[in-house]
From Swiss-Prot:
Additional notes on this entry: Negative results: has no effect on voltage-gated potassium channels Kv1.1/KCNA1, Kv1.2/KCNA2, Kv1.3/KCNA3, Kv11.1/KCNH2, Kv11.2/KCNH6, Kv11.3/KCNH7, Kv7.1/KCNQ1 and on Kir2.1/KCNJ2.
Protein name according to UniProt: Potassium channel toxin alpha-KTx 19.1
Function according to Swiss-Prot or TrEMBL: Selective inhibitor of high conductance calcium-activated potassium channels KCa1.1/KCNMA1. May be insect specific.
Gene Ontology molecular function terms on file: ion channel inhibitor activity; potassium channel regulator activity; toxin activity
UniProt-annotated site: Aromatic residue of the functional dyad, residues: 30
Pfam family, one: Toxin_2
UniProt-listed InterPro entries: Scorpion_toxin-like_sf, Scorpion_toxinS_K_inh
Amino acid sequence: AACYSSDCRVKCVAMGFSSGKCINSKCKCYK
């Protein structure tokens, strides 16, 4: 599955993280 930075960021923010980005096609969230 492809990882889209915008979708990842929205998903992470919705879970209470400050941001997120794609690394090796996986969404990683940041505090």
